[in-house]
Amino acid sequence: MLESESRCETTANQSSSDVDKLKKTKDNLEWVARFNISLNEDMERHYGFCDAMCKIAVAMFGTYAFASLFIGKSIAYSVCGVVVTALSILTLVVDFKEKQIRAKSQRNRYSSALASVDSVKDESDCKALNELLFEIGKDDLPSGTICDALAINAAIDQMGRDVTYKANVGTFKRITRYIIPWGAPKYGHR
C-alpha cells in the first residue's frame, strides 16, 4: 500500500513541476513578445516622425528656394537649395517610410504571436511558438541599448512585474536614443 501511494505522490509532484515549468515557459514567451512589440512600436513612431519632418522640411525649404528664382538670388537662397537637396537625398537613401512600415509589420507579427501564447497547452506548443518568435526576430531592425531598455521598461509595466528591475534611462538618453545609440542605461534598483 505504501509503495502505490508513493508512486502517486511522485507522479503528482512531477505533473506539478511540469505545470510550473510550462507556466514559466509561457511567461517567458509572453515577455519576449511584449518586449519586441514595444521595441517595434517605438521604432515605428520614430521613423514615422523622421519621415514626416523630412517631408515638411523639404516642402518648406523647397518653397523658399523656388521663390528665390522670382525674388532674386542671394546666399540664403543658395543655402536653402542645398538643404533641400541634402534632405531629399537623405530621405531617398535612408527611406524612413520603409523602415516605419517594416517596424509596423514586425509589431503586428509579434502581436499575433502574443495572442497565441494563451493557446499553448504543452511543451511542443512552447517550442513551436519559440521557433516562431525566433523566425520573426530574424527580420527585426537593429536597435541600440537605450531602445532595448525602454522596451524592457514597457514590458515590465505591461506584465505588472517588479519596477525595481526597470532600467533608469535619463531624459537626454531617451530623447537622443536614435541619434546617439551607444549610451547605456543603468539597471537594477533605483
Regions found by a protein language model. Give the residues of each.
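Hydrophobic, membrane-inserted alpha-helices
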Residues: 58-66, 84-88
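Conserved non-transmembrane functional hotspots
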Residues: 2-60, 90-190
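Membrane-interface helix caps and helix-loop-helix hairpins in membrane proteins
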Residues: 70-75, 98
